[in-house]
């Protein structure tokens, strides 16, 4: 468990907590959901923010101090992440914002997923031989969907916040103007994508200094992005999707060979969607609906698993059952899930306890089910280059948000004069049925591109609530987001505290390839041997088995905050895997 320090720092700060009343913050371990009979507090003692970058967490804290609520703070955190984590998210991308309004008790998800432009038909992504053009699907203008993140920031401020949008954007505008130190992952990521990014004049203008690429430790300023944010703050939706910024975006896409229309930008809309809700062992789980695949998969896995008391099982059998639930949920993900505005998603059936009970009956508690006995084809993936933040404010409002540009530095294209790095989310569609995408996996008809359609996602911002606790959690990590959130929920149910949950060892199974991926030290030698004896194939760090990814992939960056209603104590956890720097959990009290 991390040790809390009362001293603030900007470097390496990953969770910043604002205490607004005498009760103190604590990272003491969470107890079971019904362990206490103490009175339930009406409101948290303060506010908690957990994000992947110190400056983003600090920006949210600043807005809370200025009188904003969790939704205003979310605007500040999201926009600042767009400035300081360009490898992962930005105004040129999209995301999901799961919201809880404490006053009304209402939960809603803002779907700000990117949409396919009219030009984005399957045929446009095939070469002369009819094969998938991989360069076009992940690089440049053709790989980019119409961005949704700016519209989400406008909606958060207008419908849910209490401060002007311009005020909540002020921290990100300042940081974009004054700059921040380049960290190692930024510099290394640019080096790995340099050939693509330097194809485009607008990108070269931002990332080259005297002809040389950004280097670790130097101050990175983005005046064009600051101007774009300023226009968004001054003019709201029209400041990005119409007028000056829109004209520059359209010109940049056209110059790079793409085809966007002004009406497509002006016509973008955030969708309000009803979250998926279900019960698990005394917890109410609220999570993301389609076009996220996460909520339906979580409902299936947890409702399968509630047939056993996992906390009483040995490591081998517990892991076996969790993996078997993953296997079945990911099989269904492939066949049934897509944008609900275009595809008939059987959500009621897939999230029902009866359906989960039927799946549970197919699990042998002592033997692995070969994936080829569960008919179908592999699941489409998305990349690790995503970010997540979690917020609880002093009124009890909550935000869980996951946002992305898809691959490392998205499409690599910045339309000149905007500072906006465009996403490459078009690769998350099934661009050619039966052909693997950038990650060697397949896609099928439910996720085929159509004008205005939103691509399937694994982003899974989630709330947990019991009589005693309220929790927000989420993580980046591509298709493994869902299983990492699952393991986080199981950790909380087992009584772990927030920091312990964020640091839990992780493993993953996605049906096909039929292999358990695991990070370093996820399994003891005895557990690994026991799983293999049950018939599971393991891909452990150092292995070279085909289809496995071992520890070379990032295993998420989980950010979570927790309110213990009985003790009226807030705590939080920030993932020690965070690639920006070493994870720390720190406190801020009034006057600091």
Residue ranges and their predicted role:
Residues 11-23:
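Bacterial N-terminal signal peptides
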Residues 272, 383-386, 408, 457-459:
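Short, small/polar residue-rich loop motifs at catalytic or cofactor-binding pockets
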Residues 83-109, 259-261, 398-466, 494, ...:
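Active-site rim segments in enzyme catalytic domains, especially the processed small/beta chain
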Residues 319, 453, 485, 493-552:
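Extended C-terminal subregions enriched in glycine
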């Amino acid at each position: 468990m991390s040790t809390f320090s009362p001293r603030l720092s900007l470097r390496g700060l990953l969770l910043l907590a604002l205490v607004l009343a005498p009760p103190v913050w604590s990272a003491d371990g969470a107890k079971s959901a019904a362990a206490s009979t103490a009175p339930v507090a009406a409101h948290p003692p303060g506010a908690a923010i957990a994000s992947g970058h110190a400056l983003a967490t600090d920006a949210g804290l600043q807005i809370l101090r200025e009188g904003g609520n969790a939704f205003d703070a979310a605007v500040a955190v999201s926009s600042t992440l767009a400035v300081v984590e360009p490898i992962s998210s930005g105004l040129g991308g999209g995301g999901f914002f799961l919201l809880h309004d404490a006053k009304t008790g209402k939960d809603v998800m803002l779907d700000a997923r990117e949409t396919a432009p009219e030009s984005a038909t399957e045929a446009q992504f095939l070469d002369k031989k009819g094969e998938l053009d991989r360069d076009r699907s992940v690089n440049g203008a053709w790989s980019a969907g119409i961005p949704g993140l700016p519209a989400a920031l406008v909606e958060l401020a207008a419908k849910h916040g209490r401060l002007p949008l311009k005020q909540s954007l002020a921290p990100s505008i300042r940081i974009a103007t004054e700059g921040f130190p380049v960290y190692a992952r930024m510099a290394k990521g640019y080096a790995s994508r340099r050939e693509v990014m330097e194809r485009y004049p607008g990108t070269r203008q931002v990332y080259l200094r005297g002809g040389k690429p950004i280097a670790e430790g130097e101050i990175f300023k983005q005046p064009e992005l600051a101007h774009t944010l300023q226009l968004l703050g001054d003019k709201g939706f029209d400041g990005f999707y119409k007028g000056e910024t829109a004209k520059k975006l359209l010109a940049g896409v056209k110059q790079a060979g793409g085809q966007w229309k002004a009406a497509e930008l002006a016509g973008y809309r955030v969708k309000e969607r009803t979250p998926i809700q279900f019960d698990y062992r005394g917890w109410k789980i609220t999570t993301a609906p389609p076009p996220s695949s996460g909520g339906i998969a979580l409902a299936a896995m947890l409702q399968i698993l509630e047939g056993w008391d996992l906390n009483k099982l040995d490591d081998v059998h517990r892991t076996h059952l969790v993996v078997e639930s993953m296997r079945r949920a990911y099989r269904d993900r492939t066949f049934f899930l897509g944008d609900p505005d275009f595809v008939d998603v059987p959500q009621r059936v897939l999230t029902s306890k009866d359906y989960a009970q039927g799946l549970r009956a197919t699990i042998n508690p002592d033997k692995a089910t070969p994936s080829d006995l569960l008919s179908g084809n592999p699941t489409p993936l998305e990349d690790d280059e995503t970010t997540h933040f979690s917020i609880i404010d002093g009124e009890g409002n909550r935000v869980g948000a996951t946002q992305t540009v898809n691959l490392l530095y998205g499409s690599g294209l910045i339309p000149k004069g905007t500072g906006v790095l465009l996403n490459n989310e078009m690769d998350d569609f099934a661009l050619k049925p039966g052909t693997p995408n950038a990650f060697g996996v397949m896609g099928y008809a439910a996720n085929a591109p159509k004008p205005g359609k939103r691509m399937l996602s694994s982003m899974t911002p989630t709330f947990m609530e019991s009589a005693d606790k309220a929790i927000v959690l989420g993580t980046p990590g591509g298709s493994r987001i869902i299983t990492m959130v699952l393991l986080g929920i199981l950790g909380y149910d087992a009584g772990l505290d927030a920091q312990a949950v964020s640091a839990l060892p992780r493993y993953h199974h996605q049906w096909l390839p039929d292999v358990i991926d695991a990070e370093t030290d996820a399994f003891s030698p005895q557990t690994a041997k026991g799983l293999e004896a049950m018939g599971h194939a393991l891909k452990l760090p150092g292995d070279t088995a085909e289809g496995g990814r071992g520890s070379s992939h990032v295993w998420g960056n989980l950010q979570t905050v927790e309110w213990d209603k009985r003790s009226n104590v807030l705590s939080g956890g920030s993932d020690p895997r965070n690639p920006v720097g070493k994870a720390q959990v720190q406190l801020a009290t009034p006057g600091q």
